[in-house]
Amino acid sequence: MGNYSTNISDNQWQFIKKSLDLGNRKRKYSLRMIWNAIMYLVKTGCQWRMLPNDFPKWQLVYYYYCKWANAEDFDLLLSKLRDKERLKRCQNMEPSLGIIDSQSVRWGNNRSLNGYDGNKKVKGIKRHVVVDKNGFLLTVMVTVANVYDGKAVELLMKTLFYFLIPVKVILADGGYRGEIIEQIKNKFGYLIKVVMRNDDKKTAFVPVSMRWVVERTFSWFDNDRRLCRNYELLMENAENMVKLSAIKLLLNKI
């Protein structure tokens, strides 16, 4: 087995194994090797078929990736890692504050669905995310880039509600103004608070209070080459890669 920097440590593997109840059944290839392969792919951005020979066959790695994704194991692991880190920081395990924003990403696969974001001048997809006050991912939804933030927010809130995340207030930018705020409050109980930049003061750049946290999360995503462009044919896979990037970030804090 190659000694890659993305390989999972003993402590990290014990946490994954316990969180997902993977057991100790003997296999030809250990599940730890499968996880190492997935982390390598997310970090380097290589194709499934281009995984090094140090790892199990790519078909087997992809099989487990699909199995865990369909079973929502990535969501479960992300939740447990986030809870662990919040407790470590002496914070409540369940976040009450969220920050919402979107990131337009250029497409890298001619067969994938894509749109054109006229604001950012980007042709590709758009990642809609909600993070907690630390910048840790709560939920993600991927659409084509021409979907307006205000139109995507209801489906994003539906996903947040599905995972029973008890957020009370969600900070947003001006793209989420309008009737949708009242609709979200009535339907899901989330209060979306629009925080705008004060343009009256012509001074040096000052980050908008708390909202800068989600921008930092987007910069964390860009550290993983798989997320620098969208190479996924399916939107679900694009969402899973974001979750895996967030998992990798939190695993490194163990």
Predicted regions mapped to residue ranges:
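Short alpha-helical elements
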Residues: M1-I254
